[in-house]
C-alpha cells in the first residue's frame, strides 16, 4: 500500500511520458479522476478512461505528444508533487503560484473543488497546492 497515491499517479505519468508510452494504467479514485480531468482540459493528456475491474477500478490515461512518430516531443515537460502527506502546502488567494511564469499550471484543492491556479484566481479562493505541471 502507498502512503501517497497522488504522488504514485504523477510518477507513473512522468515515467510513461519519458518512455514515450501511448498509455498508462492507474488505480482509480475520485481525486485522481478530478486531476486527470484538469490535465485533459488544459491539453496535457489526450484522454482518460475508467475501466471497471470489480475492485476500485482502473484509470487508463492516454498520453499526448507533439510532432510525428519520428520527431516526437513531450507535451508534459515536468510534473511535480508539491503538497505531500508529511508536509502539506496551503496558499491563500493572494499567494497562488505562477508555474514557469504562467506557462504551466498549478493544481489546487479548494473548497470549490480541484481547480487550476488560474481558476482559483478568478474564483478568489486559496487551498492546498497538489502539483505543478509544465
From Swiss-Prot:
GO terms for biological process: translation. GO terms for cellular component: ribonucleoprotein complex; ribosome. Pfam families: Ribosomal_S8. GO terms for molecular function: rRNA binding; structural constituent of ribosome. PROSITE patterns: RIBOSOMAL_S8 (PS00053). InterPro entries: Ribosomal_uS8, Ribosomal_uS8_CS, Ribosomal_uS8_sf. SUPFAM superfamilies: Ribosomal protein S8 (SSF56047). Keywords: Ribonucleoprotein, Ribosomal protein, RNA-binding, rRNA-binding. One of the primary rRNA binding proteins, it binds directly to 16S rRNA central domain where it helps coordinate assembly of the platform of the 30S subunit. Part of the 30S ribosomal subunit. Contacts proteins S5 and S12. Belongs to the universal ribosomal protein uS8 family. This is Small ribosomal subunit protein uS8. It comes from Kosmotoga olearia (strain ATCC BAA-1733 / DSM 21960 / TBF 19.5.1).
